[in-house]
């Protein structure tokens, strides 16, 4: 009997051991940013299709989850109140000091419990659930505690030198929210380099992108935001957990203001600098800030306002002291309006005696040559980490990254790294981290699509390093592969990806609106069509989209050509007046290629424009007629001719167009 008991016991132990070996706990699910803590369990939870809320404050969060889940999967969920059941997602607010304002807990078993101390934390938790459900219909069982390592996790977009539509900014906000990036800074004024405009400040573009009643006509005619539009944009961002930081940059980068009021410009250092000896400068800027910050419902709604202060000349002691006084004045002015001022770090560059009070303000630390981290920390400044050589992108520039390699960010950087100094992780004086995209090179052919292409990979890497920080465990190669599978955000396709290729239209009729999944075909595709040619007038359009037009006969030369935003380019090829032709357009991220009857006809690749002296024939750029009006032969810039092919509407053409096909390049 004793022997039988021993045998049975051994058999049970063996069975238990075998069962334990075969059962596997769920690995940490891949989401961006990476979860800061995960304890996997066994099995998955099938969704019931219900989102249960007990607190009315979470109703909108639940509705947002249902909306975005449907956009992502085509399936529906319903918001309900009452007792949770199997497969329900349950949202709750519970006081939890450990979580802070933005952290949350997940407990996924028979139900999925998402608890947070605030609606912000709950919203971020729903972004995690959406990513988990991106490629699978069930949720992995387990527990997560997810808490951001840094408060400000952001991106700065230069809208001063390049205008971006409200519709694009709203999509950008959706993308940022999907990756828990909570801060968008809009750089609202700036100017081009005068070298590219004949060395003449009057000819050099300078733009301010916000409507002003105080100074009618100040806002740029080629694109600006009304005050109502900016208020609406901020409210939209707030609904996604994002704060917008408006930036009005001065006392340098002010050409828009000195074009408007020439007497404010510096005769010694150029019109892109204010003359700080002129008291009218203070009057002008005081009134501008008053317009946007005064009253019960100010135009600048958020907690932060950026006052600029970067790259002003520091040639003399007197100039440095005037700059410091100017900086101090606007820090205190912004504080009087109840806001927290942010400024670009420049106080090592502008060293001096005039006090600049760090209390209640934040430095954007972008260059150790302008502001030394150890000195600024010792002086008591709170700081945003955004070291230029690590996190700056300048499209088509030769002096900064054109396309930022995000492997360095992911492998080596956190907001504790300021470029010249690494502070202790989560040092209380580190406000957070940001990256920036600057449109320095005015007129370089870069479109909103090219900008977005440069933003996306970096945004995902920055999201990880600002939220998860030093707790990151996913190897870079794995991150780089899997991040692409998450897409941009529910309902967002700024990359122009075309699903279910190939897409075919057998007979393209003129003057029609097309029902295709995209309005413009993104890079990495080829668009082919057959055309039985008839005479076409100059300006005859094949297709149009939100940002582009493709011509069968362009309005200038009568050749195949296209318009992207304000940029016009054409091939050196005109369709015959009769006969059959096969056309293929390849659109890559750096070129637009034309094939005629299967043969490569022309590549419209990037070209370099040299700044030339008008009287120096030897330096004249051959080829294209588009030239820069400038004089310095040592300066140059690249010009891009890449096309998102428009496919929203057809034009009024005479020729018969058939077999239009969209496929992979």
Model-inferred region functions:
Residues 21-148, 341-350, 357, 485-488, ...:
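Acidic, contiguous N-terminal accessory segments
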Residues 98-273, 280-282, 286-304, 333, ...:
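Feature activates predominantly on carbohydrate-active enzymes
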Residues 184-186, 230-237, 527-531, 577-598, ...:
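Short tryptophan-centered beta-strand motifs in secreted/extracellular beta-sheet-rich domains
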Residues 257, 262-362, 366-380:
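Active-site neighborhood of glycoside hydrolase catalytic domains
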Residues 355-361, 368-509:
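Flexible, acidic glycine-rich loops studded with aromatic residues
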Residues 502-563, 651-665:
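Extracellular glycan-recognition modules
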Residues 561-584:
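Short, aromatic/His-centered strand-loop micro-motif at the edge of beta-sheets
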Residues 602-659:
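Flexible glycan-contacting loops in extracellular carbohydrate-active proteins
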């Amino acid at each position: 009997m004793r022997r039988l008991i021993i045998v049975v016991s051994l058999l049970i132990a063996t069975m238990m051991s075998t069962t334990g070996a075969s059962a596997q706990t769920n690995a940490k699910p891949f989401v961006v940013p990476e979860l800061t803590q995960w304890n996997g369990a066994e099995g998955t939870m099938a969704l019931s299709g219900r989102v249960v809320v007990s607190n009315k404050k979470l109703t909108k969060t639940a509705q947002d989850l249902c909306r975005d889940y449907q956009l992502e999967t085509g399936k529906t969920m319903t918001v309900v109140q009452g007792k949770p059941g199997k497969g329900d997602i349950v949202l709750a607010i519970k006081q939890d000091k450990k979580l802070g304002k933005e952290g949350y807990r997940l407990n996924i078993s028979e139900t999925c419990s998402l608890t947070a101390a605030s609606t912000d934390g709950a919203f971020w938790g729903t972004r995690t659930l959406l990513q988990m459900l991106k490629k699978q219909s069930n949720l992995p069982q387990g527990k997560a505690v997810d808490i951001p390592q840094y408060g400000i996790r952001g991106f700065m977009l230069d809208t001063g030198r390049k205008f971006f539509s409200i519709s694009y900014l709203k999509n950008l906000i959706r993308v940022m929210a999907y990756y828990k990036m909570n801060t968008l800074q809009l750089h609202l004024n700036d100017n081009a380099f005068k070298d590219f405009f004949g060395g003449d400040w009057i000819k050099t573009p300078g733009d301010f992108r916000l409507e002003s009643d105080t100074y009618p006509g100040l806002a740029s005619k080629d694109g600006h935001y009304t005050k109502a539009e900016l208020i609406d944009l901020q409210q939209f961002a707030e609904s996604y957990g994002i704060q917008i930081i408006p930036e009005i940059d001065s006392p340098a980068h002010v050409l828009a203001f000195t074009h408007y009021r020439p007497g404010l410009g510096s005769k010694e250092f150029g019109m892109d600098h204010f003359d700080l000896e002129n008291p009218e400068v203070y009057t002008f800027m005081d009134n501008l800030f008053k317009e946007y910050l005064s009253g019960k419902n100010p135009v600048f709604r958020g907690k932060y306002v950026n006052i600029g202060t970067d790259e002003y000349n520091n040639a003399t002691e007197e100039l440095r002291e005037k700059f410091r006084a100017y900086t101090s004045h606007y820090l205190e002015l912004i504080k009087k309006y109840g806001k927290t001022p942010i400024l670009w770090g420049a106080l090592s560059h502008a060293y001096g005696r005039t006090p600049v009070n760090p209390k209640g303000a934040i430095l954007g630390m972008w260059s150790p040559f302008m502001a030394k981290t150890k000195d600024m920390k010792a002086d008591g400044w709170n700081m945003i980490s955004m070291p230029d050589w690590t996190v700056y992108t300048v499209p088509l520039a030769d002096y900064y990254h054109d396309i930022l390699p995000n492997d360095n960010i992911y492998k080596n950087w956190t907001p504790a790294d300021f470029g010249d100094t690494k502070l202790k992780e989560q040092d209380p004086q580190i406000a957070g981290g940001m990256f920036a995209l600057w449109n320095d090179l005015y007129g370089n052919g870069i479109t909103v699509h090219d900008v977005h292409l440069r933003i996306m990979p970096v945004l995902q890497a920055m999201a990880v390093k600002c939220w998860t920080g030093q707790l990151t465990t996913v190897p870079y190669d794995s991150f780089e592969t899997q991040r692409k599978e998450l897409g941009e955000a529910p309902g967002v396709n700024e990359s122009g990806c075309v699903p279910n290729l190939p897409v075919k239209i057998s007979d393209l009729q003129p003057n029609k609106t097309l029902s295709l999944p995209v309005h413009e075909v993104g890079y990495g595709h080829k668009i082919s069509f057959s055309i039985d040619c008839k005479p076409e007038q100059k300006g005859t359009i094949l297709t149009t989209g939100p940002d582009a037009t493709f011509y069968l006969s362009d309005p200038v030369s009568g050749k195949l050509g296209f318009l992207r935003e304000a940029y016009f380019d054409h091939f050196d090829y005109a369709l015959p007046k009769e006969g059959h032709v096969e056309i293929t357009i390849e659109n890559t991220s750096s070129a637009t290629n034309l094939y005629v009857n299967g043969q490569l006809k022309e590549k419209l690749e990037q070209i370099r424009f040299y700044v030339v002296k008008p009287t120096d024939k030897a330096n004249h750029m051959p080829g294209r007629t588009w030239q820069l009006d400038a004089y310095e032969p040592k300066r140059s810039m690249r010009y891009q001719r890449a096309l998102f092919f428009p496919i929203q509407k057809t034009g009024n053409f005479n020729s018969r167009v058939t077999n239009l096909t969209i496929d992979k390049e």
